[in-house]
Amino acid sequence: MILYPAIDLKDGQAVRLLHGDMDKTTVFNDNPAAQALEFVAAGCEWLHLVDLNGAFAGEPVNAAPVEEILRQCKVPAQLGGGIRDMATIERWLDKGLARVILGTVAVENPDLVREAARAFPGKVAVGIDARNGKVATKGWAEETDVEVTDLAKSFEDAGVAAIIYTDIMRDGAMKGPNIDATAALANAVSIPVIASGGVSSLEDLHALKSCGAALNGAISGRALYDGAIDLAEALAVLKG
């Protein structure tokens, strides 16, 4: 399994939100590129980036810090937030991004996801953000009636590289991930699943690893910044 350290960008800073609420922000680093370099120096092989402002605006907002991270860090990075058309997808991939994460558009314009996955094999992931089993969009501000598993299964034959599954009520809360829902999703689809939201201890990582090969990785943010998870130990758990 791969550990994806999260760098969530708001107003040019690396932050964490509680339950996806933009009014409940903790700033962890004024220099996101420096934070990214710390993660890489510690042995991380991927970076998970989120343009929080972009997720609400529907277009890239924190492009400058993302581009700086891509310039300075020599490991692949995936980015979500505000990527809702082919031009934006192409622009980010041209700038060296390894993978784009399509969330809102996966609900509102699934054909774009399929088109992008065909055009850029291995470079398109679907972000499924859930609250009480239902998909939320537009920076988690809007809830839909779409079931998580139904949305995931609709992309079975689309060629997407991964599904990033986030339980919103666990995100930033340090209460552990939703293991049951994550495992159920991973076992319901053939697409690799990456778990996000609530990873707060080495025990959580052990629990996710026990879900089996269907789970490709885990994203952690606040626990790494707070020191609740030792990064070296976390990497060892997931590689072991």
Swiss-Prot record:
Keyword Amino-acid biosynthesis: yes
Keyword set, alphabetical order: Amino-acid biosynthesis, Cytoplasm, Histidine biosynthesis, Isomerase
Source species: Ruegeria sp. (strain TM1040) (Silicibacter sp.)
Molecular functions per Gene Ontology: 1-(5-phosphoribosyl)-5-[(5-phosphoribosylamino)methylideneamino]imidazole-4-carboxamide isomerase activity
Gene name tied to this protein: hisA2
The protein's name: 1-(5-phosphoribosyl)-5-[(5-phosphoribosylamino)methylideneamino] imidazole-4-carboxamide isomerase 2
GO BP annotation list: L-histidine biosynthetic process; L-tryptophan biosynthetic process
One GO location term (cellular component): cytoplasm
Entry annotated with the keyword NAD: no
Reactions performed catalytically: 1-(5-phospho-beta-D-ribosyl)-5-[(5-phospho-beta-D-ribosylamino)methylideneamino]imidazole-4-carboxamide = 5-[(5-phospho-1-deoxy-D-ribulos-1-ylimino)methylamino]-1-(5-phospho-beta-D-ribosyl)imidazole-4-carboxamide
Pathway: Amino-acid biosynthesis; L-histidine biosynthesis; L-histidine from 5-phospho-alpha-D-ribose 1-diphosphate: step 4/9
EC number: 5.3.1.16
Active site: 8 (proton acceptor), 129 (proton donor)
Location within or outside the cell: Cytoplasm
Pfam family, one: His_biosynth
InterPro entries: Aldolase_TIM (IPR013785), His_biosynth (IPR006062), HisA_bact_arch (IPR006063), Isoase_HisA-like (IPR044524), Isoase_HisA-like_bact (IPR023016), RibuloseP-bd_barrel (IPR011060)
Predominant subcellular localization, coarse grouping: cytoplasm
Family of the protein in this entry: Belongs to the HisA/HisF family.
